[in-house]
């Protein structure tokens, strides 16, 4: 692993998104609906649904909202969303990978294109930056919730089938092969760990510092993409701030 750490960035993004919680719930409902529709409504038999429900809970999504999305899928709704990705560069040459769930591809493509062009970025062709990212399972343990030291956590992670452990003052960050993600997550929970975050994500192989004079524009681009109702995830290769 390149040493790229996500946890502080995730915390910062979640804090910044408090004012957008309604939109976040809308996006999570869409993910839950599609996961339940494609893999069944029982999270015990549908790892994707379970992962999305865990993600919803970590964002304090009300239980009733989760149940409604699942019932909508059970009820045979004809509503359908396509999974689409977009790739490009932010100001300063930082690679950006966008995942969307949409019922109108033209609308989403237009929204994404406008976000890039109005904020100093450039939308690229399919495959232009995807190769710069690796799909990984990502799990976080808040150090304040466990008495285990780094050696013990590393042992448990390796026993569970995890690939890598990174530590900071406040968290243990675990990376897994995507196919092993659910097994590693379940094993760590069984070992008694409380997980602060658990998701499938995209990790940049290398990172690019955002130039000081491009930082505001870069942040505006990410915000514009995340403001789109259809965009589910925005991944960048921006270097962590010191």
From Swiss-Prot:
GO terms for biological process: regulation of DNA-templated transcription. It comes from Lactobacillus helveticus (strain DPC 4571). It comes from the Bacteria. Gene3D superfamilies: 1.10.10.200, 3.30.70.980. Residues 1-22 are annotated as: Disordered. HAMAP family: Transcrip_reg_TACO1. The keyword Transcription applies. Belongs to the TACO1 family. Keywords: Cytoplasm, DNA-binding, Transcription, Transcription regulation. It is found in: Cytoplasm. Pfam families: TACO1_YebC_N (PF20772), Transcrip_reg (PF01709). One of its GO terms (molecular function) is DNA binding. This is Probable transcriptional regulatory protein lhv_0777. One of its GO terms (cellular component) is cytosol. NCBIfam families: PRK00110.1, PRK12378.1, YebC/PmpR family DNA-binding transcriptional regulator. SUPFAM superfamilies: YebC-like (SSF75625).
